[in-house]
């Protein structure tokens, strides 16, 4: 099920977020955790890609466990700051093969002491969103920042980048954490 179908209802949705284990870990315990969490009947479960891509190898495998074993809509995170375009294309192909249609496309944290972007990397999440959209019928989400992205000089600049994400194919947005509801309400009225 596409997340936009869930999010376009008046119902309150509760979701769970999974952090895959580090590379080389055994997945049996994590698959049991997925089953235990699925028994709670969340509207969907998201699976992170890992800070700087460190746990990215298991994202698709756990999202597959969520969707195809436990029959809960899965939202696979995909970050591009620490991945080449070839790696991203490979992940997108895996998602298609496993019929995981919901993707949260993020730039992610830039690895420390790294030249970024390299010629074979995406600079912005909007570029990643465009490529995901061009490679399949995915339901793509993106991040938004009610208090402004730390790298944006102004909130207006941040809203320009937000529009670029939507224009590239982003269908829903999720906020970073905020502590003042008025800031979020003002942000959504400006957006």
Positions of the model-derived regions?
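Glycine- and other small-residue-rich loops at beta-strand/loop junctions that grip anionic moieties
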Residues: 48, 55, 77-80, 121, ...
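Hydrophobic faces of well-ordered beta-strands that scaffold small-molecule active sites
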Residues: 14-16, 45-47, 74-78, 105, ...
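N-terminal amphipathic alpha-helix/helix-capping segment at the start of soluble metabolic enzymes
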Residues: 1-16
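Glycine-rich, positively charged N-terminal anion/phosphate-binding segment
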Residues: 3-4, 27-35, 52-72
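Alpha/beta enzyme core
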Residues: 27-44, 92-103, 122-139, 149-168
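Active-site-adjacent beta->alpha loops and helix N-cap segments on the catalytic face
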Residues: 54-63, 85-87, 112-129, 179-186
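Conserved small/polar residues in nucleotide/adenosyl-binding loops
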Residues: 187-191
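Active-site mouth loops of central-metabolism enzymes
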Residues: 16-28, 75-86, 143-156
């Amino acid at each position: 099920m596409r997340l936009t179908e869930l999010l376009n209802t008046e119902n309150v949705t509760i979701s769970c977020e999974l952090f895959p284990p580090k590379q080389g870990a055994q997945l049996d315990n994590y698959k049991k955790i997925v089953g235990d969490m699925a028994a709670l009947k969340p509207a969907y479960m998201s699976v992170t890609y890992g800070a700087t891509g460190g746990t990215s190898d298991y994202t698709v495998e756990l999202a597959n466990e969520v969707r195809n074993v436990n029959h809960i809509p899965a939202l696979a995170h995909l970050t591009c700051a620490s991945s080449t375009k070839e790696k991203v294309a490979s992940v997108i192909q895996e998602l298609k093969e496993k019929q995981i249609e919901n993707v949260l496309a993020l730039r992610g944290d830039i690895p420390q002491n790294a030249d970024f972007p390299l010629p074979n990397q995406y600079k912005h999440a909007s570029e990643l969103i465009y490529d995901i959209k061009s490679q399949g019928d995915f339901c793509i989400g993106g991040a938004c920042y009610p208090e402004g992205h730390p790298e944006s000089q102004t909130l207006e600049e941040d809203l320009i980048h937000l529009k670029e994400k939507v224009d590239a194919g982003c269908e829903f947005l999720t906020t970073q954490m905020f502590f003042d509801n008025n800031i979020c309400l003002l942000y959504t009225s400006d957006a």
